[in-house]
């Protein structure tokens, strides 16, 4: 799968790209932009398209989004000297991938921006994603946005703007991207090399975001969902096995995706309890297993689990909670068991 910096195609967001182009053509391009929308809909791909436009000037001799163009190749290969990217990196000491953008990265960025630009058309900072900034990094980035060096454009990708400080949001021009309509979604999925007729259950879960469908497919989400549902109707040993599985998903595909296996059960269980069986079912066993689960405890308690699960990725990534134990306790509560039993 192409990374956003390598992707020449953009689906469904022509209006947002055109708005940026008009601002650039006016000669009064705002220096800070916030690209918002659900994960997987193309925000980072758009950010790199906009970056290539800035780096090539307002009237380039060649299309900067043509893979054969010089600026496209430099951006794709990470060799464009006037492009600065803030994203999560591996911890140099431990080798493990960090889950936040740390202040040392922001300081390195600031130092680089005070050097003379290599090209003639300005410099670009891409932050992918602003959701991963910690408090210290937010403060450093805010200073950059408030007092930008001449010719610098900052493009912030953001999945949930309500979770980042208003001081940053208020200083940016916002491009709000929407989920793709079905026809555009299918074109984007086909272009990415995925089955032209993907599983309807995955399409339902993707919610108009091609990148999300790719991620769910690669993580084998539906298979894990089925085994998690079945384990919730089984013994403590079954729950323990499911906790091992979820810890494995967290390690390979991210704690957010592992937690989503549980939040999907909560959300769809609550919907089924109030509206009846859901179509399409995500897996064959879904309706009967959800009915059994929601029948064991009051619906308000079931819904109360949602808030707890929303905090779980943070606890796993930032507080370094033991994932197997955390997932076991969450599974036990969903199954209607008393809290406090350690994983077996």
Label the model's feature ranges:
Residues 114, 139-153:
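Conserved catalytic/switch belt of AAA+ P-loop NTPases
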Residues 119-124, 149-155:
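Loop/turn-to-beta-strand initiation segments
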Residues 129-133, 161:
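Conserved Walker B
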Residues 135-136, 166:
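Conserved D-loop-proximal element of ABC-family nucleotide-binding domains
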């Amino acid at each position: 799968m192409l990374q956003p910096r390598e992707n020449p195609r953009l689906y469904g967001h022509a209006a947002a790209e055109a708005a940026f182009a008009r601002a650039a053509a006016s000669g009064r391009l705002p220096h800070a932009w916030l690209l918002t929308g659900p994960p997987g809909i193309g925000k980072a791909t758009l950010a790199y398209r906009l970056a290539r436009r800035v780096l090539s000037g307002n009237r380039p001799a060649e299309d900067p989004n043509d893979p054969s163009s010089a600026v496209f190749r430099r951006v794709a290969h990470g060799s464009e000297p006037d492009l600065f990217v803030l994203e999560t990196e591996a911890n140099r000491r431990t080798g493990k991938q960090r889950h936040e953008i740390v202040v040392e990265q922001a300081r390195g960025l600031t130092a680089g921006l005070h050097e003379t630009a290599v090209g003639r058309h300005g410099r670009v900072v891409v932050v992918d994603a602003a959701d991963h900034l910690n408090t210290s990094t937010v403060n450093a980035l805010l200073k950059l946005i408030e007092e930008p060096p001449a010719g610098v454009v900052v493009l912030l990708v953001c999945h949930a703007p309500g979770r980042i400080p208003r001081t940053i949001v208020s200083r940016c021009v916002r491009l709000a991207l929407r989920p793709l309509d079905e026809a555009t979604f299918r074109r984007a999925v086909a272009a990415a090399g995925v089955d032209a007729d993907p599983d309807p259950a995955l399409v339902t879960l993707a919610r108009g975001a091609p990148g999300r469908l790719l991620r769910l497919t690669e993580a084998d989400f539906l298979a894990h969902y089925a085994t998690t549902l079945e384990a919730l109707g089984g013994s403590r040993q079954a729950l323990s096995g499911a906790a091992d599985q979820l810890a494995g998903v967290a390690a390979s595909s991210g704690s957010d995706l592992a937690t989503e296996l549980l939040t999907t059960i909560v959300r769809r269980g609550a919907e089924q309890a109030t509206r009846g069986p859901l179509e399409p079912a995500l897996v064959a066993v879904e309706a009967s297993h959800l009915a059994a689960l929601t029948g064991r405890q009051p619906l308000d308690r079931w819904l109360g689990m949602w808030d707890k699960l929303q905090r779980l990725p943070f606890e796993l990534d930032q507080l370094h909670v033991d994932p197997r134990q955390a997932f076991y306790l969450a599974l036990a509560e969903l199954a209607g068991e008393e809290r406090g039993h350690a994983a077996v």
